[in-house]
Amino acid sequence: MELPEYEVYAIKYGDRVGTRGQIFMHGDPHDAPLAMDYFVWVVRNAERTVVVDVGYGQAEGERRGRSFLRCPSEGLALLDIDAATIEDVVITHMHYDHAGNLELFPAARFHIQDDELSFVTGRAMTYKALRHSFVLDDVLDMVRLVYGD
């Protein structure tokens, strides 16, 4: 059996410079600067295009002090992909920088692990340190997209 071949593209839409103490829980606040880039991914072949993660929006990026180089849908357009026509989107996890532009994909079926949705709608979100990386509206939108009619 021959498996289909796919092309994989990383589309950078933002970046930041911080320290480990700012980026990771329990990081050393005395660390040197640490650069971090933000990407959405495209996996495609002649029959199918899948987007992996959808990035954050400009307003959320500004609220968190992140750069916003381009809207992820503009990055997709550079590959002649219309976000509005994508049928499958995989969300690896619900952090704001992975699940913030769900509305850009009105035709998509969203794929996310049950355990991730259980986590972001469970008791762990009562702890500020754990919920810091999530946006409540993104979580609510994902619940509607996955479980709604």
Where are these regions (language model features)?
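Structural signal for conserved beta-strand scaffold positions within catalytic alpha/beta enzyme cores
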Residues: 10-12, 112
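Conserved protein kinase catalytic core
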Residues: 18, 59, 99, 119-120
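Catalytic metal-binding/acid-base residues of hydrolase active sites
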Residues: 55-57, 95, 116
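Short amphipathic alpha-helices and their capping/turn segments at secondary-structure boundaries
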Residues: 1-2, 39-45, 100-103
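Conserved beta-strand hairpin/beta-sheet module of binuclear metal-dependent hydrolase folds
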Residues: 13-74
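Active-site metal-binding motif and surrounding structural segment of the metallo-beta-lactamase
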Residues: 66-112
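Extreme N-terminal starter segment of soluble prokaryotic enzymes
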Residues: 4-7
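Metallo-beta-lactamase
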Residues: 2, 70, 75-81, 85, ...
